[in-house]
């Protein structure tokens, strides 16, 4: 549920940014249709890249901690 709310908030920010960047031009279409798909996809790609940069090292560290924990437990049982 929170993911959908965050997604809508991000889209509304993109729409407001694109609306504020078009000054002095009469817009005959709605603001949401003026945002191009390529702009949204490039923003999503940048967001995914940032998330992967953060999550991949975290997953590696957590995996290493779990591996050490598992190894120590196996040594204690032996």
Swiss-Prot record:
Query: Which parts of the sequence lie on the Cytoplasmic side of the lipid bilayer?
Result: 73-78
Say yes or no: keyword Transmembrane present.
Answer: yes
Report which superkingdom the organism of origin falls in.
Eukaryota
**Topologically, how does it sit relative to the membrane?**
Single-pass type I membrane protein
- Spell out the family assignment given in the record's similarity comment: Belongs to the glycophorin-A family.
Task of the protein: This protein is a minor sialoglycoprotein in erythrocyte membranes.
The name this protein goes by in its record: Glycophorin-E
